[in-house]
């Protein structure tokens, strides 16, 4: 036979991931789209709306659409959304344990100048409480789609097709490659983090520990970067001039 069920479990997630990431980056990095926002609104408002659009678009293109396609063609998988044998509380326990490591490490490295070159991704000078909440919420939504793709679609079918460690290797390689778009150091740092998230996802049979851990890392990085960035002023409840 030229084609069997294993081929679909291996190729469909990889094709979905490749197409979705190309589409995502072409849209969010499109200069005409940026001009649409920035030519109609003041810089700060345009920056916030463009970031919110980018994160919502990422959730849809990286997570929701691939999930719909893969659920239709691979109905035997739940892709880590639910588990019949592992209680959800296990995911919260693992996420809590990981947070004990993630928070201090991220707090330490997020203050460094090389990190502040990239974060926070919203490059406005004056931040209010609402700006911070919008920024954190946008990241939480985006990361749900991101984890649906990496720890759901790109893990469970590959484990069945390749075995646990080959699947983790492929998953982590792709995960690290995506982070090259930010910086080589971030790409290297994503390797152990990606392996740990894959192992916990397999252990808990769900994406939720990985998702909560990733949100914890993202929010810690964001809040630390906002606080330490020399070009950012936090003005609380005050309105921008």
Protein language model annotation of sequence segments:
Residues 11, 15, 88-96, 132-136, ...:
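Hydrophobic alpha-helical transmembrane segments
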Residues 29, 165-178, 184-241:
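Functionally important transmembrane alpha-helices
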Residues 46-57, 130, 134, 162-171, ...:
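Membrane-interface starts of transmembrane alpha-helices
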Residues 64-73, 138-141, 199-213:
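Hydrophobic alpha-helical transmembrane segments in multi-pass integral membrane proteins
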Residues 113-124, 145-170, 199-206:
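Membrane-interface helix/loop boundary segments of multi-pass membrane proteins
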Residues 36-48, 71-142, 156, 160, ...:
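Juxtamembrane helix-loop-helix connectors linking adjacent transmembrane helices
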Residues 1-85, 222-241:
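N-terminal, membrane-interfacial amphipathic/helix-forming hydrophobic leader that caps
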Residues 58-64, 142-151, 193:
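Core segments of transmembrane alpha-helices
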């Amino acid at each position: 036979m030229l084609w069997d069920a294993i081929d679909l479990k291996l190729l469909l997630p990889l094709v979905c991931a490749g197409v979705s990431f190309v589409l995502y980056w072409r849209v969010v990095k499109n200069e005409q789209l940026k001009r649409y926002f920035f030519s109609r609104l003041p810089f700060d408002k345009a920056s916030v709306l463009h970031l919110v659009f980018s994160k919502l678009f990422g959730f849809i293109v990286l997570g929701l659409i691939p999930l719909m396609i893969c659920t239709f063609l691979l109905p035997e998988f739940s892709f880590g959304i639910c588990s019949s044998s592992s209680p959800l509380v296990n995911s919260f326990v693992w996420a809590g344990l990981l947070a004990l490591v993630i928070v201090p490490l991220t707090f330490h490295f997020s203050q460094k100048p090389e990190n502040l070159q990239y974060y926070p991704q919203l490059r406005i000078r004056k931040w209010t409480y609402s700006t911070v909440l919008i920024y954190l919420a946008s990241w939480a939504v985006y990361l749900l789609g991101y984890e649906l793709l990496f720890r759901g679609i790109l893990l469970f079918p590959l484990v069945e097709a390749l075995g646990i460690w080959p699947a983790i290797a492929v998953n982590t390689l792709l995960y690290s490659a995506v982070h090259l778009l930010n910086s080589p150091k971030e790409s290297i740092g994503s390797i152990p983090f990606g392996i740990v998230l894959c192992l916990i996802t397999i252990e808990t049979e769900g994406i939720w520990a990985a998702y909560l851990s990733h949100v914890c890392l993202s929010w810690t990085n964001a809040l630390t970067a906002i606080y330490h960035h020399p070009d950012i002023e936090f003005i609380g409840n005050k309105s921008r001039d």
